[in-house]
Amino acid sequence: SSGVMSFLKIGDRAAGAIKSGGTTRRAAKMVILDLDHPDIEDFIEWKAIEEDKARALINAGYPSDYNGEAYATVSGQNSNNSVRVPNEFIKALESDGDWELTARTDGSTMKTVKARDLWSKIADAAWRCADPGVQFNTTINEWHTSPAGGQIRASNPCSEYLFLDNTACNLASLNLVKFYDDENQVFDITSYKHALRIWTIVLEISVEMAQFPSKEIAQGSYDYRTLGLGYANLGSLLMRKGIAYDSELGRAIAGALTAMLTGEAYKTSAEMASVVGPFPKYSENKDNMLRVMGNHRKAAYDSNDYVGISHDLLAIDQNLCPDDLLKGAQDSWDGALELGEKYGYRNAQATVLAPTGTIGLLMDCDTTGVEPDFALMKFKKLAGGGYMKIANQSIGPALNALGYTEKETDEIIQYVIGSMSLDGSPFVNRETLKAKGLNEQDIDNIENSLPGAFEIQHAFNVFVVGEETMQRLEISEEEYTSFDFNLLEKLGFTKTEIDKANKFICGTQTIEGAPYLKDEDLSVFDCANKCGKDGERFIHYMGHVRMMAAAQPFISGAISKTVNMPHEATIEDIENCYFESAGLGIKAIAIYRDGSKASQPLSASSDDGESEESDPQVSEIIENESMLMLGNYAPGTSPTKAYAGTTRPRFLLPERREGWTQEARIAGHKVYLRTGEYPDGTLGEVFIDIAKEGATLKGVLGCFAIAVSKGLQYGVPLEEFVDTFTFQTFEPRGMVEGHENIK
């Protein structure tokens, strides 16, 4: 055989040709490899290397979306990758021992590596591209209710359904916030348990009605009758109660709610078994299933005498958990175990915590699954077109729960979301805009566009006020179509004035610094990422891990959750995150470092930061050689040191300057090159516009032009740019039309 990697690439291409449900949704696939597999090192680095290739293509001008040519060209993009980690490896890691990679056929040792080195490779790859995730094999199988049927070897693509091969389950989730009374600040336990009971029965019926892709999966699903009941909106519930997601109390409440979820489901399952009998494979798994049920119950009581469990558990804190929730959890598990011992269970598994991405939108959830909120600010797409900016729906109830007055709450929310109106705005308002030459119709158009504007500048452009207004203001087409044109600055507003007006109208998008808000309440509003341009707070990655650990002892399967990390997170942070997860009894975990993929669905910041792709040694060599060009400085001297104590002058162009525009076609693509010159004819700025090449290439060319212009104004000779960039090649390329000296 050519090895597992070649066949994984075949499977990846096959998945790329399949659309989920026959529509435009991408295929969902999980690929898992045991940590002692001979090809494990290649597997770990597979997607990281492919991500590097995709970035190179994107940098060359290909679109960065997942359906674009860049990602379609590389392999490994149609699956989530995970490695299976047994307890033996964790012990080798702790003792800085060796780890053997063994043949699949006869078990012979193919290679011996340091456990620490392999662990670092996993973290490095996850840092670069968010894959692989980690599944803890020993923990998974210690909670296995049906080991007579074999080991649990794999999971579904999101990693919450962990059970025997050739089985399946249907998912259903409840919106926790719908059971919470904001006014009286009470969680309706009776209704919650009633809903859990109904949905357990519904999912059991769905086993009979479901269709399966193969005879083997149909048979396995009938034999074990696994269910996938779960919940969503935990993050919103805690915020509405005025409780921080990353807090001991928050984890105690999450543990109790999850204990009720699974306890009530198994209690109902046992009742059904008393009428129609347990699942067909129950008798051969009875002892193990009752052992697992007993461990679930012990976690509700924090009794710490678990059977067959080799790791610590984050059980419900008996002192912190509210009495009604604690009693509700314990009552559910008392009933589940008592009835199960009498009648068995209709279902081998009952619950998972799924990501609830799509159904969460339909259920009016601010947060999905067990996640905290991603950010406080949302942009809601309107049915009639356009967008409406709304704050997290939980901010108001949370402030009410924390004791803030209605006036204080309104001002805090306005601080976050803004007034979305010119009325009362400092500096930029109806009166000042009229004085600058805008008429009532112009101002009304701007006012109507503000609710969907991310920043105030987005409401001041030719698409909002129209070309006639630009002409009336004597602004040329060349100016207002330029990518860096700012109408407010053109009208004479300073950056400080624009910034203050922006915060008033569009809000800060963070609650940090809000009027009246006490410092001790800030943690209640912490999100997975920094909020807004000025936000600094976010939930530490261990806050995510501990929340998973609080819920895991009460889940039949596992938890699909992303541990969000900031762009600045290190490889060591990821190593620590994965290692701590192993010790807390989490079954499976995945991380995502902001910006680690060139294409991502949500972004918290537009700051580029330094490129993590650069080789430090190569960067150092380039920097040192560049310094030698500046003068007689020793190799290794930095520009900061060379210019210490001096000010590097920038030679600004006059506000009215001459230049020229060159229209050309490169391989049929129209390009405009515009320049600005000093009075002596020296080049001082360039602008590049290219049609029909997408926002990415246009943006890159625009940024390139700005970089060159800044360099020229700081005294970098034009020849240096010419020598550096001559003979570079990338698309679009070909014959040039429009200039007699360039072909």
PLM region spans:
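Glycine-rich phosphate/pyrophosphate-binding loops
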Residues: 26-31, 240-250, 560, 585-598, ...
